[in-house]
Amino acid sequence: HDIGFWKTQAQFYNNWEGSYTHTFLASIPHIIPGCKAPFLCNFISLSFLIYSVYIFVRTFIKIDKKNSLIVSLYLTVLLFIATSGGAEVRFWVCANFTYLPELALVLLFLSRYHLLYNGRNKPIDWLVIFALTIGIAGSKLTFIAFSFICILIHDLICRRKIDKMMIIAYGMLTILTMVNVLAPGNLVRLTDEHMHNADVISNFTLLDNTIYRLKMQFSVIFYAFLL
């Protein structure tokens, strides 16, 4: 707060991490006079996630608004169950702003892309796609940013073509993701927290956590199919 909003972004980028979306969102409450209510921030973040899940459900599942809302709330609860640090995501502002809005951006991106893929081609759709691309590339969910390349490959193989505007979007996504991944702060943080690749114990811990998360994610998919 003392060094200013934009200098704070640069400070985090150079000394902590490259996830500029999280840094940007987490800094907003500190520049709003009188905003000292973590509950309000968490509520806004959670509401945005529920809204994005609702839009996703409405886009891919043809059911009425009431049932769409019920399914959206149910899926949101399952997402929390599948999160190993669920309490942190719900109650800690930093973790809340780190993951919930970024996941919401991904769901909105997929929903909008589905509309474009099925023939809708309005300028507002592309503006939304570009805006979401900027947010996703700067998030901690970099694996999702890279996985979108699969969509591009699918279009090239199955449709034998790809929209020029989508090529621009993927170009933005790739460049901005590299800006995130190659941030000086990432290396600084790894050094400070002693996360060395040669540490066998750390690697096994990472593997165990990864397997746990995969099991939880598959359980979410299983329950979703039961709907």
Segments (PLM) and residue ranges:
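Transmembrane catalytic cores of multi-pass membrane glycosyltransferases
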Residues: 1-40, 93, 142-148, 162-227
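Membrane-interface micro-motifs in multi-pass membrane enzymes
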Residues: 19, 69-114, 140
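Membrane-embedded alpha-helical segments of multi-pass membrane proteins
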Residues: 21, 40-51, 96-109, 148, ...
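Membrane-interface alpha helices of multi-pass inner-membrane proteins
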Residues: 125-141, 146-152, 175
